[in-house]
Amino acid sequence: YCQEFLWTCDEERKCCGDMVCRLWCKKRL
């Protein structure tokens, strides 16, 4: 299961797709 856009994330909880984790999931520019 992955973290959606703007959900909090960490090493254990990865973001969905190719979003990057910066404390929360952000879309790649």
Swiss-Prot record:
Modified residues (Leucine amide): L29
GO molecular function: potassium channel regulator activity; sodium channel regulator activity; toxin activity
Localization terms from the record: Secreted
UniProt keyword annotations, A-Z: Amidation, Disulfide bond, Ion channel impairing toxin, Knottin, Neurotoxin, Potassium channel impairing toxin, Secreted, Toxin, Voltage-gated potassium channel impairing toxin, Voltage-gated sodium channel impairing toxin
Tissue specificity field: Expressed by the venom gland.
Disulfide bonds: C2-C16, C9-C21, C15-C25
GO cellular component, as recorded: extracellular region
Entry keyword tRNA-binding: no
Domain of life, per lineage: Eukaryota
Function: Spider venom neurotoxin that blocks voltage-gated sodium channel Nav1.3/SCN3A in human (IC(50)=1 uM) and rat (IC(50)=1 uM). Partially inhibits human Kv11.1/KCNH2/ERG (40% at 10 uM).
Miscellaneous field: Negative results: has no effect on human and rat Nav1.8/SCN10A.
Entry comment, domain topic: The presence of a 'disulfide through disulfide knot' structurally defines this protein as a knottin.
Similarity comment: family membership: Belongs to the neurotoxin 30 (phrixotoxin) family.
Protein name (database record): Beta/kappa-theraphotoxin-Pmu2a
Organism from which the protein derives: Pterinochilus murinus
